[in-house]
Amino acid sequence: VFARASAWRARTFSALRHPHYRRYWLSQLLSLVGSWMQATAQQYLVLELSGGSSAALGYVTVAQFLPSLLLSLFAGAVIDRVPRRRVLITTQLVLLSTATALAVTTHLGVVSLGLVMVLAFVSGTANAFDMPARQSMVVDFVPRGDVPNAVALNSLSFNVSRTIGQALFGVVAALGVSLLAGGDPDRLSRLALPFYLNVGSFFAVLFVLATLPFPPREIGQHGSVADDVREGLRYVRATPAVRNVMLLVGLLSLTVINFNVIIPYYARVVFGAREAAFGTLSAAFGVGAMAGALWQASKPNPARNLRVGAVILLASAVALAFTPGPALAAPVLAACGFGMLTLLVSANSTVQLTIPDHLRGRVMSLYSFVLVGMGPPGALLASTLIGREGPLGPRWGLVTLSALGGVALLALWGRLPRRITPPAAAADPPGVPAD
């Protein structure tokens, strides 16, 4: 038993053997706790400012993810031309600035829905470059054999931090009542404390990014940015494994992967939850996602679980639609998180291991485009369908979103890859230790 447990541990966390990746992973974990605490506080703030409007939540989500829809392809060409360290430090400084602005305006009581939307748009612009750059840098610090594990551990970090950050939101907001709101639980300034803590969390990852020894990489010859974008698009169109995985991720992101709208609306409006229960329900989703990432971290062939993750995600979303209250919603949301992360880690690893390195920035930006860029239309679709003022209401609106996702899965079922075909002459970059 102990030998099996030890083998599982070594297999599941193999990428953390590499010290540079380990430093980055730990700093990112700390920073993301602050980011998730801010994201949860921002959702709650929007609902408070708008009187519980699902449409307002949808509009802010559109503002946050619209830049990925508009800029992802351009961002990929930039990432393949510019050193990744420079891109990442720049994006982190922009995100630090927007977090500071949100903290100060909320504390002073001058925050407005329009200001939140503007800051969400600026943050989204930074994330349009940050997300594909972070995904691309996985191959800089781990050998090829550990790439699937590193992708899974990145998702684990994302969801451990989601669980901690969302659970801390209720506690920190309660502290904010006494520290920032003069004991008044209805003053919006209580919500500034999560934003201030997020500001502090950026400094760890900035220090690590400034001191990590990024390996040299071949930038190569480039034409115009438009030519580079077209080259990436041609590659995806000509590579069925990558094309079909991206189609599935994009279609599910448009329909059912809209939990940044679904969870806060169900928690605050449908179930009537206050800060503590709101944070608990959000954290339950993160616990399930964390379990999905851990499960995927020990799998040598990530392509096998694309279908499994999608089925679990869709079935649990339907179950959430018929859940009567927050107590039963927590395990259902955990199942949603497990299914979503099983799908997304499988998809990301499959794409990362299939593409050549000279196209990595462009292809991963296209992946970000279909995952995050579908957020704006998906958020509008979700907020329209699940809103109490909408044509279907929360229950049948969510069932409809799940059914649309199910149609997409059935259409692509036979075309999804079952194993990974690596690019020709795949090799580890200079400076990365071999397995």
Where are the predicted features?
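Short, membrane-interfacial amphipathic segments enriched in basic
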Residues: 1-16, 216-227
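Helix-loop boundary and gating motifs at the non-cytosolic
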Residues: 5-66, 235-285
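Helix-boundary and loop/linker segments of multi-pass membrane transporters
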Residues: 13-19, 106-110, 187, 233-239, ...
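Substrate-agnostic recognition of the 12-TM MFS/MFS-like secondary transporter fold
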Residues: 22-40, 61-79, 83-98, 115-174, ...
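Hydrophobic/aromatic positions within or immediately flanking transmembrane alpha-helices
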Residues: 25, 41, 58-61, 88-89, ...
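Transmembrane alpha-helix termini and helix-breaking/packing motifs in multi-pass membrane transporters
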Residues: 44-50, 103-108, 164-195, 269-270, ...
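C-terminal transmembrane bundle of multi-pass solute transporters/carriers
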Residues: 69-74, 81, 85-97, 101, ...
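Helix-loop junctions on the cytosolic side of multi-pass membrane transporters
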Residues: 109, 136, 140, 189-191, ...
